[in-house]
Amino acid sequence: VLAQLEGLTNRRYIKTHLPLDGIRFLDEIKYIFVGRDGRDVFMSMWNHWHNMKPEVIHEMNNAPGRQGPPISLPLGGVEDIAAGFDDWLSRSSFDWETNGFPFFSHLHHAATWWEYRHLPNILMVHFEDLLKDTDGEMRRISEYLGISVNEDIWQDLVDGVSFNSMKSNANNMAPGGSQDIWKDTSNFFHKGTNKRWQGVISQEQSSAYAELALKECGPELAQWLEFGGRMD
């Protein structure tokens, strides 16, 4: 990875799922955090987990120098989603978290960035806002990064990040798309919508999530994760 970054001639970027307290923070680097309703995060995670090839999970668990608990293979079938939500809400892979199984707690992850959202080199972006106003959010991100907008090609860029465009170009757009990680690479881009959990999990489960989000994140962050809205 480091060799790839060193070889880039354009601006370097790293995508990570690490919380802010899990990375080295530098004033000269700009950070973008993308938030989402935790119930939507679960739906996306559930699809990715069941779409990963078992041999890939095994290889990740046995990578040289790997630290931390192993990633579990999916428990049951993709249709067992309601039981999976209960596990996600009440189990953890790490001693310092109480939820997020089998990967990490989205709520803890979001809270670490939220605490420092006032810093000039942290931009808070919400998935819902990206869907509703793709053009506006792309311009906001471009301004934050100091990237000039070329109006001659701008609409092509906006069209290029649409769900249908990325799904049709999944081998190039999906993480690991060219590395045979997924059972179905195009299924990495599964739906690209929010609120799919409605009618899938029960009202009791949804309420349990809302209660946990309020406890772990506080009212402001819990509300932002659910509804979005620009922070500036």
Can you name each region flagged by the protein language model?
Residues 46-50, 118, 142-149, 162:
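Hydrophobic/aromatic-lined pockets within catalytic cores
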